[in-house]
Design a protein with these regions (language model features):
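Adenosine-phosphate binding glycine-rich loop
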Residues: 256-330
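Segments forming oxygen-rich coordination pockets for charged ligands
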Residues: 1-190, 198-204, 223-227, 309-330
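Cytosolic regulatory regions of ion transport systems
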Residues: 200-203, 236-237, 243
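Short alpha-helix immediately C-terminal to the canonical SAM-binding loop
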Residues: 194-198, 262
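ADP-ribose/adenylate-binding Rossmann-like module
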Residues: 189, 227, 232-235, 243-268
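A short acidic, amphipathic alpha-helical/loop segment
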Residues: 175-178, 240-245
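Conserved SAM-binding strand-loop segment of SAM-dependent methyltransferases
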Residues: 205-211
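Short amphipathic alpha-helix with an adjacent loop that forms part of the alpha/beta core around
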Residues: 213-224
């Protein structure tokens, strides 16, 4: 979420005015995100913002600090659609118990929660509230319909990981959709508008190279935090893409293709100055191993690997082990 938007909200509250967050600021409340949801709509965001007072300023200030410190943190939103049900809801017969009362009150709420499960908000909350507030860190929501009368959602306060799809191949078409859906920022690069267009790649950044080949790729720069997937059509420009990704020092680089083809790519990239260490950094073949063959199946294998790389990047070994124990996967 944009820091300037949060600072503007703080200023509005200090002046006694109603702050404004739009659905562009909090996409979970957008028309597309709430379509078919009887309990949430763009108007729900307006209701929450109208309920805020000066007492909510510390919550927003904590969000600003989280952005400055690059924490894994979220602003969360409690949406109440039936106040009586919200405060009187009960645990179900399957999951663990979360106290003897429902939500602490029947009013909407803005709150802060980070990955360390620190919660900041303007009012007391119940144990059942805390359970659902912590779950927004798996966001934008998780188990949000477990208790009646209310629902929950959130917006991340950290930047998403950027994934470069080099090549507008059929696999890239499927991967762009999946990667966007699981929270990556996607950029697709190709040299042919017949393949790289809005119809095939809506809702992602598209960069059409200015040359007939991929030589203009050198005009672009990836961040060391970015992930690069080499998926060029017919593998024609895989060597150039591998060299570019390694020269950019991308965090993750993966290339599609069989061992025979990759051997040829190795000879070409070596001649271009790539070291053996850089070559070994490239995941070959890209994606998790589970028998994927079709473009859609390959995209699932790739995005699963990207999720795993992101997970390992964000959480240390102790945190990952604790998570696995909690799931019963020793």
């Amino acid at each position: 979420m944009n820091k300037k938007v949060i600072l503007a909200a703080i200023e509005a509250l200090e002046l006694g005015e109603t702050p404004v967050f739009t659905t562009e600021d909090v996409p979970a409340f957008s028309e597309d995100a709430t379509r078919g949801n009887a309990h949430m709509s763009p108007a729900s965001l307006d209701t929450i913002m109208a309920s805020l007072t000066k007492a909510d300023i510390p919550t927003l200030e904590r969000a600003v600090r989280a952005i400055d410190d690059e924490e894994l943190a979220w602003l969360g939103f409690k949406v109440v659609y039936d106040p009586a049900l919200a405060v009187n809801n009960v645990d179900n017969a399957v999951t663990r118990k979360y106290g003897d009362v429902g939500s602490a009150d029947g009013d909407p709420l803005l709150f802060f929660c980070n990955d360390a499960k620190e919660i900041v908000c303007s009012r007391p909350v119940s144990d059942r509230d805390v359970f659902q507030m912590k779950d927004v860190t798996r966001g934008p929501s998780m188990h949000n319909e477990q208790f009646e009368g209310l629902t929950w959602t959130s917006v991340a306060l950290f930047e998403p990981v950027r994934v470069w799809l080099l090549g507008a191949s059929d696999v890239a078409v499927e991967l762009a959709k999946l990667a966007t859906h699981v929270g990556f920022e996607v950029t697709v690069v190709d040299n042919d508008v017949a393949y790289l267009n809005e119809r095939r790649f809506p809702d992602v950044e598209r960069i059409l190279l200015s040359t007939e080949d991929f030589s203009a790729l050198d005009e672009l720069t990836a961040s060391p935090a970015d992930y690069v997937c080499v998926l060029t059509r017919g593998h024609m420009y895989d060597p150039e893409c591998c060299v570019w990704a390694e020269r950019c020092n991308a965090h993750y680089v993966g290339m599609m293709g069989c061992a025979g083809k990759n051997g040829t790519v190795y000879e070409i990239v070596k001649a271009s100055g790539l070291t053996d260490e850089q070559w070994e950094h490239i995941k070959r073949p890209i994606g998790l191993k589970f028998g994927a063959k079709t473009p859609a199946e390959l995209a699932i294998a790739i995005v699963a690997e990207l999720i795993d790389v992101r997970y390992i990047q964000r959480y240390d070994a102790e945190a990952r082990e604790r998570h696995e124990r909690g799931l019963g996967r020793e």
